[in-house]
């Protein structure tokens, strides 16, 4: 699961996540929820954490991180959140056997700096700036290329342009 979805930026609705949790419980599936774009939501929208969904705690592994929020995707870092004790023990055992999961000192300092009031203020200001740019882009297309459809923009910072109205076939578009 990727919430908000990458690459389209859709924030999954709670009712859809509840249904996913029901199915995962019925079929014994572990859900790995990539929520790395969760800090990047616009228009007052928020991304529901999968662990907060009814019935999800027993089978959920949630990954968050700072790469998208702070623009340092080259820094290898993720927060893994597992509420269920047995699932966490299985994950930790595997992590230990595979020798991964430690932080280098630089990443450690980045994480400590980011999870502060100043870090949140920076993310909020960055999101406002990105949203303004998305609006500029949408306005430009509405004025100059009105048949192009701008898609995305709930979460993440990616917009897609549907150019189909300007071409009579896929071959022409290519």
What is the predicted role of each segment?
Residues 1-174:
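PLP-dependent class I/II
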């Amino acid at each position: 699961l990727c919430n908000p979805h990458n690459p389209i930026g859709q924030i999954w609705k709670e009712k859809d996540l509840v249904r996913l949790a029901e199915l995962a419980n019925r079929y014994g599936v572990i859900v790995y929820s990539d929520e790395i774009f969760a800090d990047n939501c616009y228009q007052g929208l928020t991304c529901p954490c999968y662990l907060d969904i009814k019935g999800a705690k027993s089978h959920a592994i949630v990954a968050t991180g700072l790469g998208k929020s702070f623009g340092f995707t080259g820094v290898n870092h993720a927060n893994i959140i597992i509420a269920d004790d047995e699932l966490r023990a299985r994950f930790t055992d595997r992590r230990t056997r595979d020798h991964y999961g430690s932080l280098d000192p630089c990443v450690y300092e980045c994480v400590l700096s980011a999870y502060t009031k100043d870090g949140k203020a920076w993310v909020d200001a960055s999101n406002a700036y990105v949203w303004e740019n998305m609006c500029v882009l949408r306005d430009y297309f509405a004025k100059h290329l009105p048949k192009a459809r701008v898609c995305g923009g709930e979460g993440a910072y990616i917009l897609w342009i549907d150019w189909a109205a300007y071409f009579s076939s896929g071959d022409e578009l290519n």
